[in-house]
Structures are given as C-alpha cells and as structure tokens.
Amino acid sequence: MQVSVETTQGLGRRVTITVAADSIEKAVKSELVKAAKNVRIDGFRKGHVPMNIVEQRYGASVRQDVLGDLMQRNFVDAIIKEKINPAGAPNYVPGQYKEGEDFTYSVEFEVYPEVELKDLESIEVEKPVVEVNDADVDTMLETLRKQQATWKETDAAATAEDRATLDFTGSIDGEVFEGGKATDFVLAMGQGRMIPGFEEGVIGHKAGEEFTIDVNFPEDYHAENLKGKSAKFDIVLKKVEVRELPELTEEFIKRFGVADGSVAGLRAEVRKNMERELKGAVRNRVKTQAIDGLVSANEIDVPAALVEGEIDVLRRQAAQRFGGNEKQAAELPRELFEEQAKRRVVVGLLLGEVISQHELKADEDRVKALIEEMASAYEDPQEVIEFYSKNKELMNNMRNVALEEQAVETLLSKAKVTEKPTTFSELMNQTTTA
C-alpha cells in the first residue's frame, strides 16, 4: 500500500492510496472460496460448484465488495500510520479500476485543529456573592400567591396590576392593518405582551369606556411593514378585574408538598428551593464567563463537518420542542443554528484540550453529588437516583457534565476571579435575560 497526504485548504486533507493488484486478487479469491461453499446452482451439489463458474456468476459483485472493503480498511491503516485525526465522515473518491492492475483512490476529509491554549491567565471572571434572605423568601411567597390568584370584576379604573378584557382596532394613517383587530382580548397588565404605550393607555380607564390611544411600533418590531410606524388603537374596555390573592392557609400550603401545612414549613421549603436555584445560577454565571474568556483568548479553525453535525442536532431538538418530526427538522433553515453550532464546536474543542492537557477524569464523587442535587428537585429523590444508576447512557451523560465542571474549575484556577456582591433578584433576573 502506497500512501500520500496533502492539504487541500485549511483543515481539509486528501489521502491518496494505491493498493497492489496482488492484494486485491488475493482478497477476491478468498471471498470467492467462501461464496463457493454456500452457493446453489442447478446441476451442482451445494459446495461443489467449480470455481470458474462461481467467479463467472459472482466475480463482479465480489470484486466490487472487496474494493469497498479494502478502501475503508486501508484508509484506517493510513491515518493510523500518518497519525491523522479525521473530523467528520470521509468522502471516498475511487479511481479507475482495471482487473489485474494496482488500484488508486483518494479520500477527502477534514482534520481536528491543533489547539494550543494561551492567555488563560487573562480570563476575567466576576463571581456573584449572594445569599437568600428573608425578604427574598417573602417575595417568592408573594409570587406563589399571585400564581394561584383568582380574578374578581371591578368598577374601578384599571391599574398596572389588573386584568382587562377589551376589543381593539389598530390603524395607520386611517387604514386598519393586518393583525390589528381583536375581540374579547384578555390583557394581563405588567407582562409586556403589548407594544410600549398600549398598556399605559388602558390604565386609568373603567369598564364600559371607549377611547383611542396613540402608540409607536418599535424600530425592531418583527413585522417589517409596522417597524417604527405611528398607530392609533380604538379600544372598547369591556371588563376590568382585580387579582385576589389566596391567604396562606393550611390547605393552600399543603398544595406545595408541605405536610404540616405551616407557614414556617412553607418558608423552609421555599428557601431550600431558592438556595438550590441560586447555587445553579452562580455556577452557570461563573462557567459562562470562564468559557467566554477561553473562546476570546483562543481563536481556532473549526471543521465544517462538525458544525454541520451540531446544526443537525440543534434542528432535531428544535423540532422536538414544537412537536415536529425528522422531516420538519431538516426543513428548518441552517442559518438559524449556525452561530450556536459553531460556538458549541469551538467550546467542545477547547474544553477537550483543557481536559487532555491536565489529564482530567470524571470524579465519581462529583458525579454522585450532581445526581443527588438534581434528584432533590423531585418528589422521590431516591427513585431518581436509582433510575440514573441503572441507566448507562444517563450515567455517562452525567460524567460528561462532571468532567466539564472540572475543566471549568481548572480554568478558574488560572483566571482572575473577583467576587461581586449582588442580590438574589438581580442575579436571577440576569440569568433569565442572558
């Protein structure tokens, strides 16, 4: 076998391989002998068909199979010998084959980039320092009460905390625009569902009133024909409702799994959940900064094949979230996922180099702790833990999570980490909008 390697462009490589004719003939003969033992041809007993007839009947297909097999096996041998690390599936380009002659073919593929980590000491990370206090728990309890609230009709003017039922007709320069009309539209104030100025125009009005408000569509509005336009909305306010919050009764509290139904028990449960969320938010905040710094400090070429693979994964995930199938996933524009896919590949390659350089292995104690932490959010944590322990794929996924955490900790040990005091609400709001 003769092998030559050339660089096509960037990470692209082409390996050209020549297989000796005698190697091909030897492999073909071996396969024909195997075939002769099992073929059935009228006039001959099984296993006693003359080789010349077997070759006449099956020679072409056997030879084709042998060439395909030799192409793959010799390519594997070649990349091992040349110490090449392909990224993605190779593309085989067969040459012209003539029986009894050497066979030359080429294989085109991309390789993984050579990664040399640098400037890790320049990475800057702000670590949030925050605790859950009583006021945070009070706010969360108020949120829980609002989630369980009922609505009661009122004759009072609408406020920023109320719910309104209304008809509206929107127009620009006197012309009603598409999507600008609605009947019995229920608007919960304060959720930011409408364009700026709409809710403010409703606040202060009572049920039964008819009025007009002037608003401006934002410059970045999703509908091209409405961007930056001034519009009028004729509104009929049919109903205003005020929110009635439930009292912290024993019955209400037990809905949240607090067996004794006490306010103290609910506060303790809420605090525990908030502290778990806080721990995860701090961890993710620090991790994101560390990885952002790693990516900024280390610009690398990315194999297109790996990016395409990630795009396919993201497409399928997006389709699954909205109840789609494989066909619908394939129809989603690749541009929607290209940037995210490229970043995932870059991060994977860089963290992989951190893991390799520092010879990191998944810490089984950390894996166990991660599973226990995740399971604590469920009604029966032990059942979840046992489910994971019996599922090899889930355990391997969790080991990968642990290994990634260990890689990030290695980065943090070299980075400039400063502590920044903050509050629970500030951190969680940053996490939501990030």
UniProtKB/Swiss-Prot annotation:
Q: Which SUPFAM superfamilies match?
A: FKBP-like, Triger factor/SurA peptide-binding domain-like, Trigger factor ribosome-binding domain
GO MF entry, a single one: protein folding chaperone
Compartment(s): Cytoplasm
Q: What chemistry does it catalyse, as a reaction equation?
A: [protein]-peptidylproline (omega=180) = [protein]-peptidylproline (omega=0)
UniProt keywords (A-Z) are: Cell cycle, Cell division, Chaperone, Cytoplasm, Isomerase, Rotamase
Report the enzyme's class at the first EC level: isomerase
Q: What are the annotated GO cellular component locations?
A: cytoplasm
Q: Name one GO biological process term.
A: 'de novo' cotranslational protein folding
What PROSITE patterns has UniProt attached to this entry?
Answer: FKBP_PPIASE
EC number(s): the record gives 5.2.1.8
Name all PPIase FKBP-type domain ranges. Answer: 161-246
Lineage top rank: taxon = Bacteria
Check the record and name the Gene3D superfamilies matching this protein.
Answer: 3.10.50.40, Trigger factor ribosome-binding domain (3.30.70.1050), Trigger factor, C-terminal domain (1.10.3120.10)
- Any Pfam family from its record, for instance, is Trigger_N
- HAMAP family, sorted: Trigger_factor_Tig
Family of the protein in this entry: Belongs to the FKBP-type PPIase family. Tig subfamily.
| Known role | Involved in protein export. Acts as a chaperone by maintaining the newly synthesized protein in an open conformation. Functions as a peptidyl-prolyl cis-trans isomerase.
Q: What is known of its domains?
A: Consists of 3 domains; the N-terminus binds the ribosome, the middle domain has PPIase activity, while the C-terminus has intrinsic chaperone activity on its own.
Name by which UniProt lists this protein: Trigger factor
